[in-house]
A protein has these predicted regions:
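N-terminal, motif-rich segments that launch catalysis or mediate targeting to/interaction with membranes
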Residues: 1-109, 117, 135-226
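Short alpha-helix carrying the canonical HExxH Zn2+-binding catalytic motif
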Residues: 115-126
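Catalytic Zn2+-binding segment of zinc metalloproteases
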Residues: 126-138
């Protein structure tokens, strides 16, 4: 599906149907990750950048929420080895690059609000690929059960320092970086997983989401020449 076809499909499918709710993520966990990412940046010495992001946190979170509306959530999957997504939708790495470039364009136009909104949507994908189901291109198989469990326990896995910075100079590469790590944890969070295996996997993957989000935010601000 080319870019024009995908844009048309997003318009037609924006209203969604009940099925899309089964594969959409939980945006409140993303909001938690965004908040922690900003804290990490501040603790890591990027206080000015963290202060700017904090002022726009509500806007970033709205972008995160928008990214799951309708069928857009079906473009949140990416096998890190063959680079394919959940067919026929685009892969998450390409979608992240597209959103990031749009955010940067809006920034250069002077529209900071729209830029941070789109940055939130792009960061959503970096975070989603810390979930093994997204890296394995598996929409079900315990996906929603695991994400609901994380929603109820995310505070237990909060980190506040040591962001992961300078992964790559390509927005898509941030998605692929996380997907490669998450890939190996699928057996621990699939329908055969247990609360014990959930906890083990989440102790690695949720801090990864927070730390790479800090790096991704700083990467954007550096690209914006801040």
């Amino acid at each position: 599906m080319g870019p024009l076809s995908w844009n048309a499909a997003k318009i037609l499918l924006a209203a969604g149907t009940p099925i899309h709710l089964l594969v959409a993520g939980r945006w409140d966990t993303h909001s938690f990750i965004n908040c922690q990412a900003i804290k990490i940046m501040g603790c890591d010495g990027f206080s000015a950048q963290a202060a700017l992001l904090k002022r726009y946190l509500d806007t970033i979170d709205q972008g995160v929420k928008w990214a799951d509306k309708g069928w857009k959530c079906c473009a949140h999957y990416c096998d890190p080895f063959d680079k394919n997504g959940l067919k026929p939708w685009p892969d998450a790495a390409s979608e992240c690059r597209n959103l990031f470039e749009r955010a940067l364009f809006k920034w250069k136009q002077g529209n900071k609000g729209k830029a941070f909104f789109l940055l939130g949507a792009a960061a959503h994908l970096v975070q989603d690929l810390c979930v093994p189901h997204h890296a394995r291109r598996v929409a079900f198989a315990g996906h929603q059960i695991y994400e609901k469990w994380v929603q109820g326990h995310h505070d237990e896995f909060a980190v506040s320092e040591n962001g992961i910075y300078n992964i790559t100079d390509d927005p898509a590469g941030w998605v692929l970086h996380n997907a490669k790590i998450a890939w190996d944890y699928f057996p621990y969070v699939s329908q055969t997983g247990s609360k014990t295996s959930y906890r083990m996997a989440t102790s690695i993957l949720l801090p990864l989401a927070q730390r790479t989000s800090a790096g991704f935010f700083l990467y954007f601000l550096n690209k914006a020449n801040l």
